[in-house]
């Protein structure tokens, strides 16, 4: 099921059987049958925290499970209430998003699982590898703070990626050394600056034409300056949000002043 206003699929949220678009915020009831073929045997699949909580409850019956994400932490004080219960051993297993990765100190946590650790590794962002390494390292640091030690299990489809290898052995310096040459060759920070320009329009062809026009003007204005590179235009990673088509381009240069 896709959002009618965005180039995004709807995310199933329970309870309530709601489909929510994380681009524009549209909330709609999930149909009982497929709107395309009419079949009624719809199987809901996913990898979110809600799905993971259901799997944990079915596999480990009898344990006390809580979930921390934007859905469960909406009410005032719910965040601290859940953490206090976990600290007092009133919760056996805590499922959550990145919000449980930072700043929490629980000496009795002996096992941490990082599910689908490389979900953000291949995003269209030059900082994706860096952020993934940071996140996995931070989450892994929640385990084994007490005298009994602990264990960390990381689920990944790319175990040989430098970010994963470095996070597995807490060697952030090794990741930095592998990442810096790539950044330098592409003029990404800290070796250069990047300006991203996004063109939005109600008509896709018009937005594309404006993006191409910008590239032509920019290319002409920096002619003879080999320190500036222009990439694009291309459809943005999310090519439509709120019925506005999106095209983007990037300008790379040695410093913000030049750009």
Specify the residue positions occupied by each region the protein language model found.
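Inter-lobe coupling/hinge segments of SF2-like helicase ATPases
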Residues: 1-216, 220-221, 236-239, 247-250, ...
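Conserved small-domain helix->loop->beta segment predominantly found in fold-type I
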Residues: 225-237
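Hydrophobic multi-pass inner-membrane translocation pores used for secretion
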Residues: 227, 258-259
């Amino acid at each position: 099921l896709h959002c009618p206003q965005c180039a995004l699929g709807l995310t199933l949220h329970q309870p309530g059987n709601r489909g929510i678009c994380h681009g524009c915020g549209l909330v709609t009831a999930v149909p009982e049958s497929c709107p395309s073929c009419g079949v009624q045997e719809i199987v809901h699949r996913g990898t979110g925290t809600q799905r993971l909580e259901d799997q944990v409850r079915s596999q480990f019956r009898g344990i006390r499970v809580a979930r921390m994400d934007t859905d469960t932490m909406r009410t005032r004080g719910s965040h601290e209430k859940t953490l206090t219960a976990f600290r007092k051993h009133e919760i056996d297993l805590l499922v959550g998003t990145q919000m449980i990765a930072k700043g929490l100190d629980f000496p009795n946590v002996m096992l941490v699982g990082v599910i689908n650790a490389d979900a953000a590794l291949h995003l269209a962002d030059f900082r994706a590898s860096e952020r993934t390494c940071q996140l996995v390292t931070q989450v892994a640091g929640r385990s084994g703070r007490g005298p009994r030690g602990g264990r960390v299990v990381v689920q990944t489809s790319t175990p040989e990626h430098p970010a994963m290898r470095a996070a597995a052995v807490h060697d952030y310096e090794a990741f930095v050394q592998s990442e810096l040459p790539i950044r330098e060759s592409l003029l990404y920070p800290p070796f250069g600056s990047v300006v991203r320009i996004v063109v939005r329009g109600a008509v896709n062809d018009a937005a594309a034409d404006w993006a191409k026009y910008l590239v032509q003007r920019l290319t002409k204005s920096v002619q003879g300056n080999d320190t500036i590179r222009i990439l694009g235009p291309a459809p943005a990673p999310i090519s439509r949000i709120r019925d506005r088509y999106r095209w983007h381009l990037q300008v790379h240069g040695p410093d913000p002043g030049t750009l």
